[in-house]
Amino acid sequence: ALRRADLCFTCARSEAPGRVQALLRETVLADARVLPQPEPFARLTGVTDRALEFTVRAWCRSEDYWALYYDLTQRITETMAEHRIPSPAVRVTTDAPSGKEGTSQ
């Protein structure tokens, strides 16, 4: 039996989508547990105001699923760091009580 591992990754919107897709695909294909058919999928699947969202899909034998899932998660994260692909910027907003803006107590 076969299973499909689905993973999602984000990066800063300033990155070139083609570059990120190529790195994702290269990382997935480097793992011998990933089956060549159905062909692995690594594509830009969403855009937000701060991020590009990518989906990775790879088929494997059922007995390899969990190890592959966790290993791909780690390897892709490491590959993105090695190639200095930044995570999306995090915006933090705070609300101050009425009349207290800019003060601390």
What are these regions (language model features)?
Residues 1-13:
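Short glycine-/aliphatic-rich beta-strand segments at the starts of folded cytosolic domains
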